[in-house]
């Protein structure tokens, strides 16, 4: 229904559809992968009953900043995307959207996100500048380092400390366990994503953890996912979470095991499905957190 509604805009205004594709509004998987860990932090910070204002600010913020991240990513990659099978039809490559239009849209999305942050507090506002720096720098890292996924993980996790300061005005040390867990998880699932493009990336010199890890990719991903679960277990102990939370972690572990098995042949489609599948792991952990507070 959601996608059908968006596609109806294509019939009414093909120009609007170009910008929808640029912001990936038609592909909500990135929103989910950013939203679930942010909500982990929001719910834990609020001890199971976060304020409606905090929830609304962070849900809308996730939507806007994910869109902004997609725009700046395509701007940075506009000269190489045409050489990659998966990205050769993106709006900036095809010329349907100009680089100037993309930068203006990025500025608008970031500006709207900042307006949301203004409804929080000084600590959260200051933290937001770090998030912007990470989001804007990630797309350019592929040119200089084999670890752009680490920068992406740092950016995707930045909403977690912000959630604590927004909800409580404080940033407990244990919140960084959640941050590290999400960073490790993000590096893992985005390596699956990078495996889809690895053959093309090797030809054009684009760097990624998929290129760096080589044949050890799946084992390293599973290790990263295991370390992420370990950090979440430590965080659960620090925040005094109970059985429901750990059941959520067990469900996530099952997701990770399935991904490892399904990518044994390293086929492009299988790697992409494994990337998408991480949404369910994030949701399982979130539901575990919600249930744990609900049954108290």
Curated annotation (Swiss-Prot):
Domain of life according to the entry: Bacteria
Record localization: Cell inner membrane
Any one GO molecular-function label of the UniProt entry: 4-hydroxybenzoate polyprenyltransferase activity
Cysteine pairings via disulfide bonds: none
Chain segments annotated as coiled-coil in the UniProt record: none
UniProt-listed CDD domains: PT_UbiA_COQ2 (cd13959)
One Gene Ontology term, aspect cellular component: plasma membrane
Primary location group: membrane
EC number: 2.5.1.39
Catalytic activity: all-trans-octaprenyl diphosphate + 4-hydroxybenzoate = 4-hydroxy-3-(all-trans-octaprenyl)benzoate + diphosphate
TM region positions: 29-49, 52-72, 102-122, 146-166, 169-189, 219-239, 241-261, 275-295
Pathway entry: Cofactor biosynthesis; ubiquinone biosynthesis
UniProt key word Transferase: yes
UniProt KW keywords: Cell inner membrane, Cell membrane, Magnesium, Membrane, Transferase, Transmembrane, Transmembrane helix, Ubiquinone biosynthesis
Pfam families in the record: UbiA
Cofactor dependency: Mg(2+)
Membrane protein topology class: Multi-pass membrane protein
One of the GO biological process terms: ubiquinone biosynthetic process
Family: Belongs to the UbiA prenyltransferase family.
HAMAP family named among the record's database cross-references: UbiA
Function: Catalyzes the prenylation of para-hydroxybenzoate (PHB) with an all-trans polyprenyl group. Mediates the second step in the final reaction sequence of ubiquinone-8 (UQ-8) biosynthesis, which is the condensation of the polyisoprenoid side chain with PHB, generating the first membrane-bound Q intermediate 3-octaprenyl-4-hydroxybenzoate.
UniProt-recorded name of the protein: 4-hydroxybenzoate octaprenyltransferase
Species in which this protein is naturally found: Pseudomonas syringae pv. syringae (strain B728a)
